[in-house]
């Protein structure tokens, strides 16, 4: 950024087309958050109407996780081959079909399939929309682009909680899904006329189509084996999250099988840069493991241990969700000021100061608890708004949408595991202590993984010939690309 532009407010560096593109993508993220909270809120009504068991009802939430990894891969590859815009439109169409099908669903099977479709749309939304917005904004604003965009998820969660209390008592649970289709239509209209991302256009101008992750896995020499492994992974995830398996050893074995399959896909598609991809999946996995126990079980904690009534629970959840939304935006500013990794680490360290007081204060003073949750979620959950920027920087433009979509949505399986871990620990401790200890300990794992730049470090250890020394999005150096103590002079920009 030149000296002459430093005095211009950041928002004036963006033109109308860039803001329109951002709005179209942000609405998609709002719908993601809206749907996540929506299915949890109406679960008891759906269970009662369809006569479902508790396991069947819970599987409707898990269904989205079962299909997300494949949606991230498929729609991400579409974005790499045909452009980010087409993948964004396809994602929102999948979302629309799934949402409408939920509203019209006559029974469990139809709704389960609809949730699978929604999961694919959600995954494509994350990979394509995040990549599109980040690549469309100027390099010095790309942490803001990422953070502002992800704030839509938290806003959607807050909106869903408020709409639920107004709509369901009068019109029933199906009306919520029909209401959810309105912003989808608006987002689709916005996306129809947005320009293609600048980075993608520059990369593909006058060049032959790239070989995408889908081409490598499903059209290459190992395509038959990979197709079989895809079905095996889907079946294993179904049994893990919806199959009512009581044997922990079997569940662990199936989980390990899925991990082997996903790592195999990453090794095949990333070539010599597979260590980076595998470490990024671990980063996302632990990011979900530290944050989602609170996301999923906070309402239960407020109802059971603090004995709050539904109105008070809604108020506290508003503080939590709004804090996360604000934190995404704050994280964007911090990331552009301090750098992505340094901002991430500083924010998580600050959040650690608040996590114990949140669950130690009790329920006597609702407003103090709400404020503590606001700031803890702002610092601990909100900083995840720049996670797409962090992940995307490790991938070249030609592979970024699929790389981001696949690594994030495989790691997002931690969101399905996190509530289970919290509930298991709560069998020996009270729920508040379980949530605090789980979040506190696992946050340090993420701090180490990001702070030490382990994706670059492990790449340097295992396959140094394919090491990327600079962020592909903003050209800033990767600290893990050189040995400790080598100094800034050791950074020599390399192509990958």
Swiss-Prot record:
CDD domains tied to this protein: MFS_SV2_like
A GO CC term attached to the entry: plasma membrane
Domain of life, per lineage: Bacteria
Keywords: Cell inner membrane, Cell membrane, Membrane, Sugar transport, Transmembrane, Transmembrane helix, Transport
Alphabetized GO MF terms: carboxylic acid transmembrane transporter activity; sialic acid:proton symporter activity
Catalyzed reactions: N-acetylneuraminate(in) + H(+)(in) = N-acetylneuraminate(out) + H(+)(out)
Cited function: Catalyzes the proton-dependent transport of sialic acid.
Protein name: Sialic acid transporter NanT
Gene coding for it: nanT
């Amino acid at each position: 950024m030149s000296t002459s532009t430093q005095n211009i407010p950041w928002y004036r560096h963006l033109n109308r087309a860039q803001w329109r593109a951002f709005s179209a993508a942000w609405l998609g993220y709002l719908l993601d958050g809206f749907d996540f909270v929506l299915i949890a809120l109406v679960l008891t009504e759906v269970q009662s109407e369809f006569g479902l068991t508790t396991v069947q009802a819970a599987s409707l939430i898990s269904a989205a996780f079962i299909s997300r990894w494949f949606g991230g891969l498929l729609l991400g590859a579409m974005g790499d081959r045909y452009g980010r815009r087409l993948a964004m439109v396809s994602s929102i169409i999948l979302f629309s079909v799934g949402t409408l099908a939920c509203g019209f669903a006559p029974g469990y099977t139809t709704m389960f399939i609809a949730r699978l479709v929604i999961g694919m749309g959600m995954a494509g939304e994350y990979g394509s929309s995040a990549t599109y917005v980040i690549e469309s904004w100027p390099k010095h604003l790309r942490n803001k682009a990422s953070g502002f965009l992800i704030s839509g998820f938290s806003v959607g969660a807050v909106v869903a909680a408020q709409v639920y209390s107004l709509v369901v008592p009068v019109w029933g649970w199906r009306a919520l899904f029909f209401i959810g289709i309105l912003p989808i239509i608006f987002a689709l209209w916005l996306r129809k006329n947005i320009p293609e991302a600048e980075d993608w256009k520059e990369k593909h101008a006058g060049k032959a189509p790239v070989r995408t992750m889908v081409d490598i896995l499903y059209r290459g020499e190992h395509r038959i084996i990979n197709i079989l492994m895809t079905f095996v992974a889907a079946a294993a995830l179904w049994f893990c999250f919806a199959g009512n398996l009581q044997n922990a050893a079997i569940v662990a074995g199936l989980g390990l099988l899925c991990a082997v399959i996903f790592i195999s896909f990453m090794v095949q598609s990333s070539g010599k840069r597979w260590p980076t991809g595998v470490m990024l999946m671990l980063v996302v996995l632990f990011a979900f493991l530290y944050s989602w126990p609170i996301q999923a079980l906070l309402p239960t904690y407020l109802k059971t241990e603090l004995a709050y009534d539904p109105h008070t629970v809604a108020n506290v959840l508003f503080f939590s969700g709004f804090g996360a939304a604000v934190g995404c935006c704050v994280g964007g500013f911090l990331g552009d000021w301090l750098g992505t990794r340094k901002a991430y680490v500083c924010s998580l360290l600050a959040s650690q100061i608040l996590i114990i007081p949140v669950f130690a204060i009790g329920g006597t003073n609702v407003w103090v608890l709400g404020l503590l949750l606001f700031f803890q979620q702002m610092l601990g959950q909100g900083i995840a708004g720049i996670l797409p920027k962090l992940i995307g920087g490790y991938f070249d433009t030609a592979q970024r949408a699929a790389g981001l979509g696949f690594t994030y949505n495989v790691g997002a399986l931690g969101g399905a595991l996190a509530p289970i871990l919290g509930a298991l620990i709560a069998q020996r401790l009270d729920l508040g202590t379980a949530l605090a200890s789980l979040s506190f300990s696992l946050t340090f794992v993420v701090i180490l993984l990001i702070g030490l730049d382990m994706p670059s470090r492990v790449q340097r250890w295992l396959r140094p010939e394919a090491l990327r020394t600079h962020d592909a999005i903003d050209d800033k150096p990767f600290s893990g690309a050189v040995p400790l103590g080598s100094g800034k002079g050791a950074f020599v920009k390399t192509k990958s």
